Amino acid sequence: MSITAERKQALIKEYATKEGDTGSPEVQVAVLSERIANLTEHFKGHKNDNHSRRGLLKLVSQRRRLLDYVKGVDHARYQALITRLGLRR
């Protein structure tokens, strides 16, 4: 259900803008997207898990806010990020 430390480190390395970057919006969105994908898979087998569904909605909202921030700061960076992650919008 949660992502492994190795997978998280791989995402950080892939989306980091510089060495040691763990807090940039790109990294945060990538990690959130991975967690959202894992929870979405969880719901295929556990349709009535409403406590986790609330957590999923919270993660989706947090990702949306980060994406809106990136879009406001640099639209080209936003387009590149959603293309790399395969997100709609």
UniProtKB/Swiss-Prot annotation:
Keyword vocabulary terms for this entry: Ribonucleoprotein, Ribosomal protein, RNA-binding, rRNA-binding
CDD domains, per database record: Ribosomal_S15p_S13e
GO terms for biological process, alphabetical: translation
Keyword rRNA-binding part of the UniProt annotation: yes
Superkingdom classification of source: Bacteria
MF terms in GO: rRNA binding; structural constituent of ribosome
The keyword Cell cycle is assigned to this record: no
Pfam families: Ribosomal_S15 (PF00312)
GO CC annotation: cytosolic small ribosomal subunit
InterPro entries reported for this sequence: Ribosomal_uS15, Ribosomal_uS15_bac-type, uS15_NS1_RNA-bd_sf
Summary of subunit composition and partner proteins: Part of the 30S ribosomal subunit. Forms a bridge to the 50S subunit in the 70S ribosome, contacting the 23S rRNA.
Family of this protein: Belongs to the universal ribosomal protein uS15 family.
Physiological role: One of the primary rRNA binding proteins, it binds directly to 16S rRNA where it helps nucleate assembly of the platform of the 30S subunit by binding and bridging several RNA helices of the 16S rRNA. Forms an intersubunit bridge (bridge B4) with the 23S rRNA of the 50S subunit in the ribosome.
The name this protein goes by in its record: Small ribosomal subunit protein uS15
Origin species: Brucella canis (strain ATCC 23365 / NCTC 10854 / RM-666)
Name of the encoding gene: rpsO
